[in-house]
């Protein structure tokens, strides 16, 4: 549920479907990634305290004892000053006695503006989970898609979150480097995962969105996307090179609308079974004679 008064779409992870969506910002502070059109045309704005309080009051009025989870929207709530975030978290704890978890998207530049201690304070105040779109660990690909950070910074952002004790749900995008950069993208992303050690890992497939620069590049013949089987081969190379400690449990999912195949595993325990599932998927997808290169679902 959500109670904001804006007419722009609200985006949230699938696992936040039953959460109270509390909009604390509008749009995305970066809003320059070439593959994304989520907030194009939406001026970035930090909502006033009065508007945030109004949403919380309405949610408390209609479901004070029902709210278990809260998701802070829009694209990068962590851009807020730490003091303001801590105040919001305090109010949420006061208003919702059965609150179990607060979560948010987090952009790498916003994470890097926070110290480990600040992240730890927010975790203790109730911000238990961050959804982090690292997308890739590869320098060249990050630069090409205008992510705003390099590989070292992308890794440090993720590492800082896990070091604070927060849960980290990290997202990567299969096919982001195109056919030419696929192997490099896969290997560097696996290296990043090994350093960060996320608690959750989601592999999405590239979608060429209307209004994105990457779509323009494809239509101009400057970007060569992977086939569905090629996307699975890239995922196989990533999984083959993930080397997590036996006592570190990472929940892997590929259940986004962009995925051709839904996969689930706990790494490193299920690594070999996951690789067998991927091999089967490659064999089946290789039979496709045509597919929607835009990956519109």
Where are these regions (language model features)?
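Auxiliary Fe-S-binding modules of radical SAM enzymes
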Residues: 1-16, 194-297
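Conserved strand-turn element in the central/C-terminal portion of the radical SAM core barrel
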Residues: 109, 137-141, 161-185, 204-210, ...
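Conserved, mostly hydrophobic/aromatic
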Residues: 28, 36, 52, 72, ...
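Aromatic/hydrophobic pocket-lining residues that form the small-molecule binding cavity
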Residues: 52, 85, 115, 154, ...
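Catalytic cores of alpha/beta
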Residues: 117-119, 177-195
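Conserved SAM/AdoMet-binding glycine-rich loop
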Residues: 60-163
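Hydrophobic faces of well-ordered beta-strands that scaffold small-molecule active sites
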Residues: 20-22, 70, 100-104, 130-132, ...
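Canonical Radical SAM [4Fe-4S] cluster-binding loop centered on the CxxxCxxC motif
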Residues: 7-54
């Amino acid at each position: 549920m959500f109670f904001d008064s804006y007419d722009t779409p609200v985006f949230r992870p699938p696992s936040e479907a039953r959460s109270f969506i509390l909009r604390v910002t509008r749009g995305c502070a970066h809003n320059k990634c070439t593959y994304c059109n989520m907030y194009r045309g939406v001026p970035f704005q930090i909502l006033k305290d009065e508007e945030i309080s109004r949403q919380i009051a309405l949610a408390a009025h209609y479901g004070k004892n029902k709210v278990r989870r809260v998701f802070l929207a829009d694209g990068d709530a962590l851009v807020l000053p730490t003091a303001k975030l801590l105040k919001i978290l305090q109010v949420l704890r006061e208003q919702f006695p059965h609150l179990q978890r607060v979560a948010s998207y987090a952009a790498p530049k916003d994470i890097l503006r926070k110290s480990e201690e600040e992240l730890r304070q927010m975790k203790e105040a109730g911000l238990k989970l961050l959804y982090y779109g690292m997308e890739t660990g590869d320098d060249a690909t990050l630069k090409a898609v205008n992510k705003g950070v390099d590989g070292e910074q992308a890794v440090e952002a993720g590492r800082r979150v896990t070091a604070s004790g927060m849960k980290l749900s990290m997202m990567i995008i299969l096919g982001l480097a195109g056919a030419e950069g696929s192997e490099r993208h896969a290997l560097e992303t696996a290296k990043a995962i090994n350093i960060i050690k996320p608690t959750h890992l989601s592999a999405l497939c590239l979608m060429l969105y209307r209004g994105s620069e990457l779509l323009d590049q494809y239509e101009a013949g400057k970007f060569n996307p992977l086939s569905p089987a090629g996307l699975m081969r890239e995922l196989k190379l990533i999984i083959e090179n993930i080397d997590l400690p036996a006592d570190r449990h990472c929940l892997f999912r590929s259940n986004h609308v962009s995925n051709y195949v839904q996969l689930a595993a706990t790494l490193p325990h299920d690594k070999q079974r996951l690789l067998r599932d991927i091999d089967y998927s490659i064999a089946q997808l290789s039979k496709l004679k045509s597919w929607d290169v835009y990956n519109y679902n």
